[in-house]
Curated annotation (Swiss-Prot):
Reported consequences of knocking out the gene: Mutants show no growth on trehalose as the sole carbon and energy source, but grow normally on glucose. They secrete substantial amounts of trehalose during growth on glycerol.
Organism: Mycobacterium tuberculosis (strain ATCC 25618 / H37Rv)
Residues the entry annotates as binding ATP: 37-44
This protein's name: Trehalose import ATP-binding protein SugC
Helical C-loop (motif): residue ranges: 135-139
Entry GO MF terms: ABC-type carbohydrate transporter activity; ATP binding; ATP hydrolysis activity; identical protein binding; protein homodimerization activity; trehalose transmembrane transporter activity
EC main group: translocase
Domain notes: Contains an N-terminal nucleotide-binding domain (NBD) and a C-terminal regulatory domain (RD).
Subcellular location: Cell inner membrane
pH dependence (UniProt free text): Optimum pH is 7.5. Active between pH 6.5-8.5. Unfolds at pH 5.5.
Keywords: ATP-binding, Cell inner membrane, Cell membrane, Membrane, Nucleotide-binding, Sugar transport, Translocase, Transport
EC number(s) stated in the UniProt entry for this protein: 7.5.2.-
Length: 393
C-alpha cells in the first residue's frame, strides 16, 4: 500500500499535442480513486504514466514518497488490470494467477499458498484447474484480478476492467471490486468512461476533459456542487437541465418566472467576477409534478406549465420529457459536452423531470411542474464556472 502523488504532471507528444496538463493529485494510502471522462480526455494517459508505460514530460510522480519518474514499470511495485483479460489460454487458472510469482522465482510452496489464498478471496478455488476458455467473462476478469492481487503490490491500476462484460455482469462485478478493495485496503486507481462506475465505486472521483482535471471530489460533491458546466452536464443520468437566465438585484429571471435567491447565495454569487450571461442548472429530481407537492414545498417552489412530450416509467420513478419556448442555452463547455456525447441539436431545448411513480401525467398532457429554488445552481455561461460555490481567486 502506498500514497501516490502527481505533482504538476504534464504529458506532451512531439506533434505538439498535450494529453495531460498540470495535473496535481494526491491519492491517499488505501484510497479508491476514479479517473473518469470521455474518450481522449487524458485519463488512460495518466494511468499509464503512473504505471511507467508513458514517460512524464514534466512534473514529478512519487509512490510511497519516492520519485519514480525514471523507474521502469517492473520496479514500481504496482499491478495492472486491463479491459482485455490478457490471460494465457494454454495455462490453467492456477498457472495464470501464479505467473508473476513464477517469474519472480518464488519458492513453489510459497506460490501454492499465495495462489490458494487469492483464489479463496475471489471465489475461484473450484476453478483453479480450468482453462480460460472454460470460464465466463466475469470469471475471467476475476482471474485477471487474482493475478494482480497475488503479488501484494503497493497499488492496483485498473483500465476499464468491466467494459467487455454485459450490463448485468458489470453491476455484479462493480460490487465485487468495491468489496475487494475495501477488504484489501490497497491504493487503487481506476479508469472508466462510465459515470455510474465512477459514482458507485470511488472514494473520490477525478473528472477529466481536454487533459485537465475539471474537478476532484467525492461523488456527492461532484453531483451536488459541480465546479463547472462540463462536470454538471457529464455527471448525472439523466443529465442536469440547463435554462437561460438573467441575474437581477435579488435573484434570477428565468423563461418561466422570477426566483428570489437567499441572501447567502446572493453573497456567494457576488464574490465572483460579474458574468455577462448566466445559465441555471436544475437536477431532474428537483423538478416535481406540482400536484404531488405539499403546501410547505410550494412556498419555495417556482411553478410553470409545460406540455409533456414523453413519459418513461422506471417502476419507482417516471421521467417526464418536455420542451420550453425559451431560447436554447449555449456555452463553450456545453457545446463541447454535446459533441463528446454525440448529442444532436434537435434535443438542445429538451428537459426532463424525475417524478414519483404515482404521478398521473400522460404524454401530450399539459402539466404544472415545480422546482425547488433552493436546489438550483447558477453558472457563468462564458467561463462555465459554478457561481453558487465559493470563488477561488
Amino acid at each position: 500500500m502506498a500514497e501516490i502523488v502527481l505533482d504538476h504532471v504534464n504529458k506532451s507528444y512531439p506533434d505538439g499535442h498535450t494529453a495531460v496538463r498540470d495535473l496535481n493529485l494526491t491519492i491517499a494510502d488505501g484510497e479508491f480513486l476514479i479517473l473518469v471522462g470521455p474518450s481522449g480526455c487524458g485519463k488512460t494517459t495518466t494511468l499509464n504514466m503512473i504505471a511507467g508505460l508513458e514517460d512524464i514530460s514534466s512534473g514529478e510522480l512519487r509512490i510511497a514518497g519516492e520519485r519514480v519518474n525514471e523507474k521502469a514499470p517492473k520496479d514500481r511495485d504496482i499491478a495492472m488490470v486491463f479491459q482485455s483479460y490478457a490471460l494465457y489460454p494454454h495455462m490453467t487458472v492456477r498457472q495464470n494467477i501464479a505467473f508473476p510469482l513464477t517469474l519472480a522465482k518464488m519458492r513453489k510452496a510459497d506460490i501454492a499458498q499465495k495462489v490458494s489464498e487469492t483464489a479463496k478471496i475471489l471465489d475461484l478455488t473450484n476453478l483453479l484447474d480450468r482453462k480460460p476458455s472454460q470460464l465466463s467473462g466475469g470469471q475471467r476478469q476475476r482471474v485477471a484480478m487474482g493475478r494482480a492481487i497475488v503479488r501484494h503490490p503497493k497499488a492496483f491500476l485498473m483500465d476499464e476492467p468491466l467494459s467487455n462484460l454485459d450490463a448485468k455482469l458489470r453491476v455484479q462485478m462493480r460490487g465485487e471490486i468495491a468489496q475487494l478493495q475495501r477488504r484489501l485496503g490497497t491504493t487503487t486507481v481506476y479508469v472508466t468512461h462510465d459515470q455510474t462506475e465512477a459514482m458507485t465505486l470511488g472514494d473520490r472521483v477525478v473528472v477529466m476533459y481536454g487533459g485537465i482535471a475539471q474537478q476532484i471530489g467525492t461523488p456527492e460533491e461532484l453531483y451536488e456542487r459541480p465546479a463547472n458546466l462540463f462536470v454538471a452536464g457529464f455527471i448525472g443520468s439523466p443529465a442536469m437541465n440547463f435554462f437561460p437566465a438573467r441575474l437581477t438585484a435579488i435573484g434570477l429571471t428565468l423563461p418561466f418566472g422570477e426566483v428570489t435567491l437567499a441572501p447567502e447565495v446572493q453573497g456567494v454569487i457576488a464574490a465572483h467576477p460579474k458574468p455577462e450571461n448566466v445559465i441555471v442548472g436544475v437536477r431532474p429530481e428537483h423538478i416535481q409534478d406540482a400536484a404531488l407537492i405539499d403546501a410547505y414545498q410550494r412556498i419555495r417552489a417556482l411553478t410553470f406549465q409545460v406540455k409533456v412530450n414523453l413519459v418513461e416509467s422506471l417502476g419507482a420513478d417516471k421521467y417526464l420529457y418536455f420542451t420550453t419556448e425559451s431560447p436554447a442555452v449555449h456555452s463553450v463547455q456545453l457545446d463541447e459536452l454535446a459533441e463528446v456525447e454525440g448529442e444532436s441539436a434537435l434535443h438542445e431545448n429538451q428537459f426532463v423531470a424525475r417524478v414519483p411513480a404515482e404521478s398521473k401525467v400522460a404524454i401530450g398532457q399539459s402539466v404544472e411542474l415545480a422546482f425547488d429554488t433552493a436546489r438550483l445552481a447558477v453558472f457563468d455561461a462564458d467561463s462555465g464556472a459554478n457561481l453558487t460555490i465559493p470563488h477561488r481567486a
